[in-house]
């Protein structure tokens, strides 16, 4: 169950945002073997002065189409993560023209005791999930 936060600059259409959401969910679902209805995505749009995104000296040419995917998730297999990174970038580029240099991904692992889906309960810990 990853929680996917997606940060981007303001200016995209609702349709493009929905495509980004659908593509990223489909890729995560396949590569991380998610259960049905295991979809938690939050989009935040920023003014240009609210995000400074450099390239760590890698020579990337960032544009106003930059997207940051930050996932909080149970630990994932290294090979699954590599496939997720590669496929997400490929799908975004092929389907909506986002440059691979404009996609940054970060996955932060956490445990089952770090989640409550509602009612103040730890559903992973009390057997409901």
List where the protein language model places each region:
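Interaction-mediating elements
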Residues: 1-129
